[in-house]
């Protein structure tokens, strides 16, 4: 079994990623305010416990996630040995005179608004501004973010810009951050990606990625990072009022999550531990991305990720009809 701080080499790029990685939307105050002292402690906890792979984006906190991550990472004297930094392009942050509070990110400055921009200038501007917010001189991995409505621009405009920046050494790897398997496959068929961050499509509730995307990624030697392993909450605590894909979960989804949880409980296995470890069942998956709001949550996720599970647990869930059979 993998441990949270175990490193694995990327298939195409000379980078080592820890099996458990840290997403930074929660530390930027996703849905609920987070004090900067909490975010500092969280990032230091990740580093002090051997995690090296950090994912961020201009969207998260409208620049706040990158700024908070940069407070800690920017002070490290040997960054290449300490962390792998992944951010995203496809949106720029514009200042507006009149603005309403941001419901998703209450800590964000409401005058700073994200706008999709897949133009060549927009991609360059996004990266330049990310470098400044992060306080670093290079990005390890740049992902095209939420390109489902910008597929042509991602393929024909953004990717060539990123490929050129990769040749210049400003970035080391190019990928996409996406929620849709079909979009990921279409982009992969047209450009030479190094990595895909896929949210919510290879979890205990949704194994749709294994039908086509994960086998294709193996064939193309493209690394896969799986995010959204709790499907935004229902797999962490499947009770009425839980969320699935950031919306109220249906009774059917809650019942399915409860059934999986009850089956695992009879075996003495926490649902959260199984949810965190499940994606690594597929050989295409390199890392599991978890978002944490504070160091307590992160330490709990590390413990769940490191918990030893029975070798046949996934087969047992298959036999019980609770997950799909593995498809390679």
Model-derived regions: residue spans:
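Short, acidic/polar
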Residues: 33-46, 119-133, 179-186
